[in-house]
């Protein structure tokens, strides 16, 4: 690999002295709804405090990556609250050398080394995990229950987001729901424990820290909506006024580059908000450039009046941003266009149930004239797809879609394709008006923004039912079924387009003018009749004869009924009773342990690990695949 450019890394020399960083937060919340071994009740916490042995602070539960010490743990009415000290110069070096200097480009004075470290560790390890000893059936908690505290990306217990700062009071201050007695007790116990440490530092090794930090990133890289989850945990912990979770556009600090923005954000719904100069698109940050804009009822283009209504004021809608070479539409409307484009146009139907030919008239009373381009009257050629009304497969799909939509609405989730309902109350940084300040120190209870630029919102209490309803993996099967139903609808539309007679699968019929006394011709198609079957007209349907007179041209010889050539019988319809079982995937061998094991086998079985890692569920869409195979096989 090529060497990094001089400006890609921090240019200041790295000192040998560690910056003391205080960390504070809740180890658990009593009313969070944690289940199983993760649940901690007030009686258990009171029995475990104060701990007999000092509690170490490590990274991601790695025993060889100890970076600090827990100074104090107090029993708050909301849950156990701790204060710790991190003093590891090797951890600071690893973070500083791995970070690019472009992250901290900003207007105004540059950030100090302490501020850069706080931004890095707060964004990389925003959560904490308490490891407790596993209690047996008859065992009771004692002062050896707590084993250690680990810094991690996302903890399994709710409300375990921590704050980092270089001052003890500044680390505790953001927790607005912490009781005054707990705040004062934590401050007093932490100061006493820090004096006993007398400037101690920890040095687990650069290689061990690098391996552990990389493992943390790999184990959490597929975590869905990581920052939304951090936001929810942050609100549960009652954190407000903490600034070191701020970051912004292009992975730089807020205010890194001047951006020309309209007077009002384009998502506020103002008509003038979409009037953006053409040059502003090229200057916009990469994260904000998106070909599809979701809005709430704002007319983006007058090209599609059914989906994009013109404002009632009568003024023409402003031109969308860009040079005019592409169209900006909502994602839900785009999906409707794609699905509707493949649907065939309805053909005009006659009274007999088949399409009426253009420029032709039906047989009238005896002696009436005939059209020069009248096709043979063969009603049985046209399959049932030409008749109006949904097919049984369409009715099943429509019923399934309606049931899924009703279930989502009953569960409090927005229906698919509804851009007007948001799953969370957060706002993006470009939604804030010019009068809103991100650093308003006059409002101590305000919810300040954090990465990736969420504006403050109204404070909300802890809602365990909402957290349980939006837990990961709840509606993965329903989402997969919705995708399967959409694919079936599109495939059905393509099939209807291909099988629409007489333009799709039937060969063109020659113009024929029957003579008096001739039997009505019949034609067959190999794809529509079974083997050894010939369709003949019913005996009571005798055609009307044309008027007597010389023919304008020589009559075409009548068509002779032809039998369909015998073909292979159709495959039997699979059923649930005769369907072969799905192949069973072989079990994967356990992954090899790295150079830094989390703990020995005996210790791992005796501790309760409260950190979480991203889990890839390979069986998420298996139910949807079975549904698709059954629907396709029953057609």
Curated annotation (Swiss-Prot):
Site (Cleavage): residue numbering on this chain: 247-248, 610-611
Key word Cell membrane present: no
E.C. designation(s): 3.4.21.97
One GO CC term on file: host cell cytoplasm
Name of the top EC class for this enzyme: hydrolase
Region (Interaction with pAP): 324-343
Region feature Interaction with major capsid protein, mapped onto this chain: 615-635
Active-site feature positions: 61 (charge relay system), 129 (charge relay system), 148 (charge relay system)
Composition skew (Pro residues), residue ranges: 536-574
Span list, region Disordered: 409-476, 514-606
Bias (Low complexity): 409-419
Domain note: Region of interaction between pPR and pAP is called Amino conserved domain (ACD). The region of interaction with major capsid protein is called carboxyl conserved domain (CCD).
UniProt name for this protein: Capsid scaffolding protein
Source organism of this protein record: Human herpesvirus 1 (strain 17)
Recorded name of the encoding gene: UL26
């Amino acid at each position: 690999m090529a060497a990094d450019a001089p400006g890609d890394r921090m240019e200041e020399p790295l000192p040998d002295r560690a910056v003391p960083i205080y960390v504070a937060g809740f180890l658990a919340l009593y009313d969070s709804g944690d289940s199983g071994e993760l649940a901690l009740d007030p009686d258990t916490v009171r029995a475990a405090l104060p701990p007999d042995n000092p509690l170490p602070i490590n990274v991601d539960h790695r025993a060889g990556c100890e970076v600090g010490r827990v100074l104090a743990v107090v029993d708050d009415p909301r849950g156990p609250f701790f204060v710790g000290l991190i003093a590891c110069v090797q951890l600071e070096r690893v973070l500083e050398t791995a970070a690019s200097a472009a992250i901290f480009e900003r207007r105004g004075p540059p950030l100090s080394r302490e501020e850069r470290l706080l931004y890095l560790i707060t964004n990389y390890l925003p959560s904490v995990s308490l490891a407790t000893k596993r209690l047996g059936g008859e065992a009771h908690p004692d002062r050896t229950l707590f084993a250690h505290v680990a810094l991690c990306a996302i903890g399994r217990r709710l409300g375990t987001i921590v704050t980092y700062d270089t001052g003890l009071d500044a680390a505790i201050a953001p927790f607005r729901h912490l009781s005054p007695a707990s705040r004062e007790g934590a401050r007093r116990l932490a100061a006493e424990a820090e004096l006993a440490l007398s400037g101690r530092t920890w040095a687990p090794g650069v290689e061990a820290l690098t391996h552990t930090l990389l493992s943390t990133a790999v184990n959490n890289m597929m975590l869905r909506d990581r920052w939304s989850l951090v936001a929810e945990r942050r609100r549960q912990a009652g954190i407000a006024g903490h600034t070191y979770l701020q970051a912004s556009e292009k992975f730089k600090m807020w205010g890194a580059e001047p951006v020309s923005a309209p007077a009002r954000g384009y998502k506020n719904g103002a008509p003038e908000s979409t009037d953006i100069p053409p040059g502003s698109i090229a200057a916009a940050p990469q994260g904000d450039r998106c070909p599809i804009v979701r809005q709430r009822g704002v007319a983006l283009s007058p090209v599609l009046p059914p989906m994009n209504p013109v404002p009632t004021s009568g003024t023409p809608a402003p031109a969308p941003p860009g040079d005019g070479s592409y169209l900006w539409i909502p994602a839900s409307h785009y999906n409707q266009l794609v699905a509707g484009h493949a649907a065939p146009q309805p053909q005009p139907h006659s009274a007999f149930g088949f399409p009426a030919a253009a420029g032709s008239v039906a047989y009238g009373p005896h002696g009436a004239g005939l059209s020069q381009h009248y096709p043979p009257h063969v009603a049985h050629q046209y399959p049932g797809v030409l008749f109006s009304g949904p097919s049984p497969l369409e009715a099943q799909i429509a019923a399934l879609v309606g049931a899924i939509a009703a279930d989502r609405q009953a569960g409090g989730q927005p229906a698919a394709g509804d851009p007007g309902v948001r799953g969370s109350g957060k706002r993006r940084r470009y939604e804030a008006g010019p009068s809103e300040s991100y650093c308003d120190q006059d409002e101590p209870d305000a919810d300040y923004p954090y990465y990736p630029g969420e504006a403050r919102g109204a404070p909300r209490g802890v809602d365990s039912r909402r957290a349980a309803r939006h837990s990961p993996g709840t509606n993965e099967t329903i989402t997969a079924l919705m995708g399967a139903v959409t694919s079936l609808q599109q495939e059905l539309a393509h099939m209807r387009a291909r099988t629409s007679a007489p333009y799709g699968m039937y060969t063109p019929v020659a113009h024929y003018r029957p003579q008096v006394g001739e039997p009505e011709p019949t034609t067959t198609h190999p794809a529509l009749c079974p083997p050894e079957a010939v369709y003949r007209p019913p005996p009571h349907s005798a055609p009307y004869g044309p008027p007597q007179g010389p023919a304008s041209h020589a009559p075409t010889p009548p068509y002779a009924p032809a039998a369909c050539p015998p073909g292979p019988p159709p495959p039997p319809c699979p059923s649930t009773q005769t369907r072969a079982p799905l192949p069973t995937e072989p079990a994967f061998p356990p992954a090899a342990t790295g150079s830094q094991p989390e703990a020995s086998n005996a210790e791992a079985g005796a501790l309760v690990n409260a950190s979480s890692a991203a889990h890839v569920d390979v069986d998420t869409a298996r139910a949807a695949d079975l549904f698709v195979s059954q629907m396709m096989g029953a057609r």
